[in-house]
Amino acid sequence: MQNKIGLALFGALCYNLTQGLAFTLVRMQANALGDFRTLGLVVGLPNFALVAGSIFWGIIADRWQNRKAVVVLCAMCSSILYIPLPWLGPFGLILIRTLQSFFLGGMVQIATLFSELDPEARATLMGKLEAALGFGWGAGAFLGGFLVISEDYGSSHPTVVFSFLLTASLGVFAVVGYMGSTERYVPREVIKLNFAEYFWPISRLFFTTFIMFLGYMFFLSISPIYLTEVAGSSFGMGIIVLLSGIVHAITAPYIGKLVDNYPREKAIRASTITVFLSLIIYSSTTNIYFVTLAFLPPIYMTYFLGARAIIADNIPYQLRARAMGLLTSFSLLGSGVGSIVVGELLVNMSFQDVFRLGSVLTFIAILVGWYPFKSKI
């Protein structure tokens, strides 16, 4: 069993190396090809495809009763679509990235796989998963900043082409890792359940997710560009993101244990408060040390450890993949709307003004998600 978990973690690490690389490469390429409006569309529109993909693949995973097959299929298709990106203009980049994101929506099912390994330690095991995810994302973003200097973006420069091909290759390694893992099968009585009956008692979790990521994207969607400006180079930006990934990797197992030992809602409160405070810092100073400190906390990881554990605790297995997909959909819907809005706002506003607006939205998320979530089961 430990070997199978290790293979799944290897797949998750490689997959998130691709996500970290894409986080830097796609945003920097889009910004070089156009303006902030182009960047907003390249980041925002694919999020709506991710919404559709996460819902669609969640339903497919429930019907097939095979999460691994969905993850392998989606990882392979999304990896191939990295190959043409360096040769595309703004419209082509938006189009292919949107298509790719439909398949990326199925990757949420790796979290469902881990949530089934040990019901008594769901958050602990998902903490190990998040450690691989956090380090992979941080290391990938660093590679993007290290391999390509900011002046080379906006063209099919050899370093840009190599970086996207490397991203596709790492995606193939992720497929190999996922194929070697084994999904735990537990016989269950096949009964028809009404999803709405289980959704509404914890619906506030989904609305909190939407609002928080709507506000957080007021920074995160443009973070590679902003951090490059603050740090003075894409390499400096990569160092900041790598440090964040290392913090994620080190803290993930401990945060997972805390989520197992304390009410899940505390993770929601902690992450929403932290993202609010980080946006306040971004809007108040451009000091590289303060900006770096604000970027380090594992906000995304902490939020989803708590949220996924709440879903696993309160949604029956037959509906759980759909609920996980819906959670991701709400986060991506907020991210998509936030990214497009930010692209429009930055045409006439400064970074700091945009960050202040984001802090207002995240404060609302704190209020909406503060109280415990009611349970149906």
Where are these regions (language model features)?
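Structural signature of the two symmetry-related core transmembrane helices
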Residues: A69-I83, K266-I281, S359
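C-terminal membrane-cytosol helix-exit motif in multi-pass small-molecule transporters
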Residues: G144, L166-V186, A365-F373
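C-terminal transmembrane helical hairpin of 12-TM major facilitator-type secondary transporters
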Residues: E265-L305
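Juxtamembrane intracellular "pre-TM" segments in multi-pass secondary transporters
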Residues: M1-Q2, G180-T208
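Hydrophobic core of transmembrane alpha-helices in multi-pass small-molecule transporters
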Residues: L13, F91-G105, F210, Y289-T302
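Helix-to-loop junctions at the C-terminal end of transmembrane segments
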Residues: G53-Q65, A252-P263, L346-V347
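Cytoplasmic helix-loop-helix junction between adjacent transmembrane helices
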Residues: T98-L133, A307-I310
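Helix-loop boundary and gating motifs at the non-cytosolic
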Residues: M1-N47, P201-I240
